[in-house]
């Protein structure tokens, strides 16, 4: 009798722990789904509400990304969350449609991230050509290609059952029934489909993103060093003017603070790009590694032998959710620039989200020969908001000839733009969006 009581107590403890685990899982997954819904809905609502956000072509790609992530939160995550909490798949034959939605929405999200990286690299490396070529029509074509490719590798193979591996076999050698398969909604991918879909959905896009963001960093690094050179020239000229006021010839030293500021800016750009790539890779890479490994698992081997490439379902599901979690982080990474922050604060009714900074901004003016003729600090509020940025393109300091660029020449002209004023904001958030190029008269192109 005491033995039976002990056994019942242990079973009750196991049931209680299992129930507690399910409750914690439900709370965590609910928060993840709600945060994904809220963030991406805010992005869509901001663009619908504020016309100036729709006027920027680069925001079209952010909207497409938000829509794909919103579909992940509506069509994919809730159904899997219910199955995780219930311990089985309660939606029957909806499994195949859900698998197609999962592949389509996740692929669309990743491809939109890839398109954004290409768009920002093109905008930063060739701003004049970007201004002419990247029209709303061109943006819609790129977005349509991303979504069409996502549909083609999801619904067509799934509906034709090209994605499935061989039917699962039970221990007695019989093929598992349809009901047993539907209880789990386990889509055992074939080796061919797993590798080909992973290449299109992840490996090729991530390779493109690595190349584009690496080149963006190199361009930004060159630009920051050019700005630092202008700073040093401005401070040097100011120091010399102050020290030679009495007519004496005094040697003027170059300040070390400018070198430190240059390093600080380069580090900030590197951190920004590292966050963009790091979050994406950390979320999706583990899943796609497992996605290519699992089809090679030999589950028919005897229990005593080792089974390489075999992963338990819990581990696989954890990394699936890691990938979907990227959809909740994308609005924070890609839509939290100044324009979107102001729109969010207006929509939410909390205007203190975007406090106005009071740090000083240095204005450096350069004459036609490249000599610095004025350098002074002004409060941030006295500078137009259109100028309150850090240029991340070489053309912001040295002008280019659009005709030369169109013909294939990419070398900047030696002379600087006449009366060009460069705004050097020390604390502004770095943005990798399109920056309006500067024309030959030193004004921003409208």
Curated annotation (Swiss-Prot):
<keyword id="KW-0472">Membrane</keyword>
<feature type="lipid moiety-binding region" description="S-palmitoyl cysteine">
    <location>
        <position position="354"/>
    </location>
</feature>
<keyword id="KW-1003">Cell membrane</keyword>
<feature type="transmembrane region" description="Helical; Name=4">
    <location>
        <begin position="138"/>
        <end position="162"/>
    </location>
</feature>
<keyword id="KW-1133">Transmembrane helix</keyword>
<feature type="lipid moiety-binding region" description="S-palmitoyl cysteine">
    <location>
        <position position="350"/>
    </location>
</feature>
<dbReference type="GO" id="GO:0001588">
    <property type="term" value="F:dopamine neurotransmitter receptor activity, coupled via Gs"/>
</dbReference>
<feature type="transmembrane region" description="Helical; Name=6">
    <location>
        <begin position="272"/>
        <end position="298"/>
    </location>
</feature>
<dbReference type="GO" id="GO:0043410">
    <property type="term" value="P:positive regulation of MAPK cascade"/>
</dbReference>
<feature type="glycosylation site" description="N-linked (GlcNAc...) asparagine">
    <location>
        <position position="4"/>
    </location>
</feature>
<keyword id="KW-0325">Glycoprotein</keyword>
<comment type="similarity">
    <text>Belongs to the G-protein coupled receptor 1 family.</text>
</comment>
<dbReference type="GO" id="GO:0043197">
    <property type="term" value="C:dendritic spine"/>
</dbReference>
<comment type="subunit">
    <text>Interacts with DNAJC14 via its C-terminus.</text>
</comment>
<keyword id="KW-0770">Synapse</keyword>
<keyword id="KW-1015">Disulfide bond</keyword>
<feature type="topological domain" description="Extracellular">
    <location>
        <begin position="299"/>
        <end position="315"/>
    </location>
</feature>
<dbReference type="InterPro" id="IPR000276">
    <property type="entry name" value="GPCR_Rhodpsn"/>
</dbReference>
<feature type="topological domain" description="Cytoplasmic">
    <location>
        <begin position="218"/>
        <end position="271"/>
    </location>
</feature>
<comment type="function">
    <text>This is one of the five types (D1 to D5) of receptors for dopamine. The activity of this receptor is mediated by G proteins which activate adenylyl cyclase.</text>
</comment>
<feature type="transmembrane region" description="Helical; Name=7">
    <location>
        <begin position="316"/>
        <end position="340"/>
    </location>
</feature>
<feature type="transmembrane region" description="Helical; Name=5">
    <location>
        <begin position="192"/>
        <end position="217"/>
    </location>
</feature>
<feature type="transmembrane region" description="Helical; Name=1">
    <location>
        <begin position="23"/>
        <end position="48"/>
    </location>
</feature>
<feature type="transmembrane region" description="Helical; Name=3">
    <location>
        <begin position="96"/>
        <end position="118"/>
    </location>
</feature>
<dbReference type="Pfam" id="PF00001">
    <property type="entry name" value="7tm_1"/>
</dbReference>
<feature type="disulfide bond">
    <location>
        <begin position="95"/>
        <end position="185"/>
    </location>
</feature>
<dbReference type="GO" id="GO:0005789">
    <property type="term" value="C:endoplasmic reticulum membrane"/>
</dbReference>
<keyword id="KW-0807">Transducer</keyword>
<feature type="topological domain" description="Extracellular">
    <location>
        <begin position="163"/>
        <end position="191"/>
    </location>
</feature>
<dbReference type="GO" id="GO:0042311">
    <property type="term" value="P:vasodilation"/>
</dbReference>
<feature type="topological domain" description="Extracellular">
    <location>
        <begin position="87"/>
        <end position="95"/>
    </location>
</feature>
<keyword id="KW-0256">Endoplasmic reticulum</keyword>
<feature type="topological domain" description="Cytoplasmic">
    <location>
        <begin position="49"/>
        <end position="59"/>
    </location>
</feature>
<keyword id="KW-0564">Palmitate</keyword>
<protein>
    <recommendedName>
        <fullName>D(1A) dopamine receptor</fullName>
    </recommendedName>
</protein>
<keyword id="KW-0966">Cell projection</keyword>
<feature type="topological domain" description="Extracellular">
    <location>
        <begin position="1"/>
        <end position="22"/>
    </location>
</feature>
<keyword id="KW-0812">Transmembrane</keyword>
<dbReference type="GO" id="GO:0004930">
    <property type="term" value="F:G protein-coupled receptor activity"/>
</dbReference>
<dbReference type="GO" id="GO:0071880">
    <property type="term" value="P:adenylate cyclase-activating adrenergic receptor signaling pathway"/>
</dbReference>
<keyword id="KW-0449">Lipoprotein</keyword>
<dbReference type="InterPro" id="IPR000929">
    <property type="entry name" value="Dopamine_rcpt"/>
</dbReference>
